A protein has these predicted regions:
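SAM-dependent nucleic-acid methyltransferase catalytic core
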Residues: 15-16, 24-224
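Conserved S-adenosyl-L-methionine
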Residues: 1-23, 28
Length: 224
């Protein structure tokens, strides 16, 4: 990641900007999909069953497949894309969980209802990118994309956690409602700013034993 930023790698920044744009696209997709809210209200009011809701979401994702894939665009969807599957899973899981909580506690206010459905959409997008980040083909053959995905995950993973499974896959879930309106635009602008680039030109990062580091760099009292 450091090397891509320090060298102003255009391919890396192109991928990072595509990913950031997709987050805004997901917001627009939610705004244009208010039928999801209406259908959940039908489920809440017992006008439809849980199986009816599941069937509706399946059909919704199938009918809207072009729009759903349009969230990430042609290039990103050409890789190991699981967005359609994740959208269906996350929408149904979130709505089912919302209904369970409403039965146990209280009816969600309209804003909370909207925020939760938007979170399901954003979680689906996050899960798609997490799967791409773990994809061995991308790791081995598309380092700039992999680093852009790393940057995204660092910004949107729950509590900024970084955790891997025994298989070596990153497995932290999406951060949730508080992350829905978060964008990387300011960071990307900063990472491409002249002062930062000039600073990086004079910087070196080492990953080694501290004793080896001291031998290699031979710091003086003026370095501290």
């Amino acid at each position: 990641l450091y090397q891509n930023i320090a060298t102003s790698n255009s391919r890396f920044f192109s991928y990072a900007e595509m990913i950031d744009a997709s987050w805004k696209n997901a917001t627009m997709f939610f705004d244009e999909s208010q039928i999801l809210i209406a259908k959940y209200l039908s489920y809440r009011n017992e006008e439809i069953t849980k199986e009816d809701l599941k069937a509706f979401i399946h059909k919704f994702c199938k009918d809207k497949s072009r729009d759903i894939l349009g969230i990430i665009g042609d290039e990103l969807s050409s890789y190991s894309c699981s967005l359609l599957k994740e959208m269906e899973i996350n929408l149904f899981r979130k709505m089912s969980r919302m209904h369970e909580l409403e039965l146990k506690k209280h009816i969600l206010p309209d804003k909370d209802l909207r925020d939760n459905v938007e979170t399901a959409i954003k979680s689906a997008l996050y899960m798609n990118y997490r799967r791409m980040y773990n994809d061995e083909h991308i790791i081995q053959n598309h380092p700039q994309l992999h680093n852009a995905l790393f940057l995204f995950i660092r910004n949107y993973a729950y509590s900024g956690m970084f955790r891997y499974s025994k298989k070596g896959d990153f497995n932290v879930p999406y951060g949730g409602i508080a992350y829905n309106n978060k964008l990387m635009r300011k960071k990307l602008d900063y990472y491409q700013s002249i002062p930062l680039i000039e600073h990086f030109k004079k910087s070196h990062i080492y990953n080694c034993d501290f004793e080896d580091f001291l031998r290699k760099t031979q710091p003086t009292e003026n370095d501290f």
